[in-house]
């Protein structure tokens, strides 16, 4: 009689783990990764907003897309990952003393690594983007706010 309940419980647990559901032991790691992502995005924003980067003024004319719905879950990071490629290309168009191509690549690679770790095995999510676009500063601010929100709900 209890075998069926036990097997059901095991099957449910395996299904949750296979689908990337966070476990209690991973919460601490997730918090560290979200905090790390937040710091990387803030650092990138500082460099983009730096007034010494006059060459980057044209960068602010490029349009970036943000999710149609408010990003509230880690699965929404897929949308960041998709637009991050464009941001990296735009930043490489206007290298400056504060933002050289090697730093850009290192920063982007680190952000991508963190996002992939936070996403886990969730690959079925499809991003739906808002029709309105934002500039690079607004784009980074949006994702910084997202990270702050996720981090605050975990503490």
From Swiss-Prot:
> Where is this chain primarily localised?
secreted
GO biological process, any: positive regulation of biosynthetic process
* Keyword Disulfide bond in record: yes
Pfam families in the cross-refs: IL2 (PF00715)
Molecular function in Gene Ontology? cytokine activity; growth factor activity; interleukin-2 receptor binding
Give the intrachain disulfide bonds. Answer: 79-127
Leader sequence segment: 1-20
Intracellular or extracellular location(s) = Secreted
Keyword set, alphabetical order: Adaptive immunity, Cytokine, Disulfide bond, Glycoprotein, Growth factor, Immunity, Secreted, Signal
What residues bear carbohydrate chains?
A: 23
One GO cellular component, as annotated: extracellular space
What InterPro entries would the database entry show? 4_helix_cytokine-like_core (IPR009079), IL-2 (IPR000779), IL-2_CS (IPR030477)
Its function, per the record, reads:
Cytokine produced by activated CD4-positive helper T-cells and to a lesser extend activated CD8-positive T-cells and natural killer (NK) cells that plays pivotal roles in the immune response and tolerance. Binds to a receptor complex composed of either the high-affinity trimeric IL-2R (IL2RA/CD25, IL2RB/CD122 and IL2RG/CD132) or the low-affinity dimeric IL-2R (IL2RB and IL2RG). Interaction with the receptor leads to oligomerization and conformation changes in the IL-2R subunits resulting in downstream signaling starting with phosphorylation of JAK1 and JAK3.
| Family membership | Belongs to the IL-2 family.
Q: What protein name does the entry list?
A: Interleukin-2
Tell me what organism the protein belongs to: Bos taurus (Bovine)
Q: What is the lineage of its organism?
A: Eukaryota, Metazoa, Chordata, Craniata, Vertebrata
